[in-house]
């Protein structure tokens, strides 16, 4: 039987995105232009991105929520994209995890203030790959964000279970402190078939400086991918950066693809750019696209995501993303 679909498991939060005029120093004032509410967290964002891109396969969410207004808003937001939330676990009496995202209009950068809530109560049982599932991929995120899973080797347990149930595995990260990444991620890598990270995460795990002064080093990014494969990643390792992305397959295939040139006037925020990139990669990997095209769709989806301060609202169908990228042109390549 041909496998179809992606199960996305891990931390899901309600993102409360404040678009602010600038980042204030302590004891000074900044103004909020507007506030938007949307479900967030790597599994949700990747799933919403897949559906916005036009994925034709099932996209299922495994996560936790509290029985509160935050949870109701979060799940309604997830369903609005078409995500299957029927397997989200409701934890009675718990606060739904939520994050205040401060997105600066003058820089496009964002800062996060998180209430961990029910994600600190999440266990392996909440995220276990469904028995009998015909899903092709199991995506998990993110080490360093769920206390019980961090302390119990839960991330490895889940990846191992997914493989035993016939799924390919992916692990996505969040910008947690580098020492947490170095502790939690390497033991997971031999259980990951696909592992795609940003320049900060790649540097934290491999010790290779992928970007200097904001500029991507293509050679160093490729070296980081090769080291991740040497650390155990099964089939593909990738590194993405605002200037482009690099991926290396275990069979030796290498792809280096520059990112899309997006005018500063078009950028409303970069909250979901990394997750949008991963969504594009996941769609291509699920559908067995050539590696260059996987990276191109990841870059194009990330570029479109910049048009909204929320994570997924401005992502377009996959063909429209690629057309947008073609119309804007690419940054200088390697």
What are these regions (language model features)?
Residues 1-80, 122, 266-270, 331-334:
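Glycine-rich phosphate/adenosyl-contacting loop at the front of the ribokinase-like
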Residues 1-14, 66, 75-90, 102-256, ...:
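Ribokinase/PfkB-type carbohydrate-kinase core domain
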Residues 91-95:
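A gly/proline- and charged-residue-enriched helix-loop-helix capping module
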Residues 56-60, 253, 284-298:
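Phosphate-handling active-site elements
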Residues 96-101:
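Short alpha-helix plus adjacent loop in nuclease-associated cores
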Residues 48-49, 203-206, 267-291, 295:
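Short, small-residue alpha-helix embedded
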Residues 81, 284, 305:
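Short alpha-helical functional segments enriched in proximate histidine and acidic residues
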């Amino acid at each position: 039987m041909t496998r179809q679909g992606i199960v996305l498991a891990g931390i899901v939060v309600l993102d409360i995105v404040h678009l602010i005029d600038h980042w204030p120093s302590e004891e000074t004032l900044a103004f909020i232009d507007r506030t938007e509410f949307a479900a967030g967290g790597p599994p949700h964002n990747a799933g919403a991105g897949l559906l916005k891109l036009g994925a034709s396969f099932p996209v299922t969410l495994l996560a936790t929520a509290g029985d509160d207004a935050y949870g109701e808003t979060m799940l309604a937001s997830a369903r609005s994209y078409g995500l299957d939330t029927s397997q989200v676990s409701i934890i009675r009496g718990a606060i739904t995890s939520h994050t205040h995202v401060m997105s600066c209009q003058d820089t496009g950068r964002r800062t996060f203030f998180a209430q961990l809530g029910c994600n600190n109560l999440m266990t392996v049982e909440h995220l276990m790959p469904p028995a009998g599932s015909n899903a092709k991929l199991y995506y998990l995120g993110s080490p360093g964000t769920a206390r019980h899973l961090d302390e119990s080797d839960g991330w490895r347990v889940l990846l191992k279970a997914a493989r035993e149930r016939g799924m390919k595995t992916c692990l996505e990260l969040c910008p947690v402190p580098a020492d947490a990444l170095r502790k939690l991620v390497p033991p997971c890598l031999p259980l990951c078939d696909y592992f795609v990270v940003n320049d900060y995460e790649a540097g934290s795990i491999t010790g290779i400086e992928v970007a200097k002064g904001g500029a991507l080093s293509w050679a160093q990014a490729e070296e980081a991918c090769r080291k991740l494969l040497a650390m155990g990643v099964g089939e593909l390792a990738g590194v993405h950066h605002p200037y482009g992305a690099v991926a290396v397959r275990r069979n030796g295939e290498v792809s280096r693809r520059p990112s899309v040139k997006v005018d500063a006037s078009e950028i409303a925020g970069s909250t979901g750019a990394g997750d949008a990139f991963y969504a594009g990669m996941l769609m291509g990997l699920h559908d067995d696209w050539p590696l260059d095209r996987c990276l191109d769709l990841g870059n194009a989806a990330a570029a479109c995501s910049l048009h909204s301060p929320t994570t997924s609202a401005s992502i377009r169908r996959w063909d429209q993303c690629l057309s947008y990228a073609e119309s804007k042109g690419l940054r200088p390549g390697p």
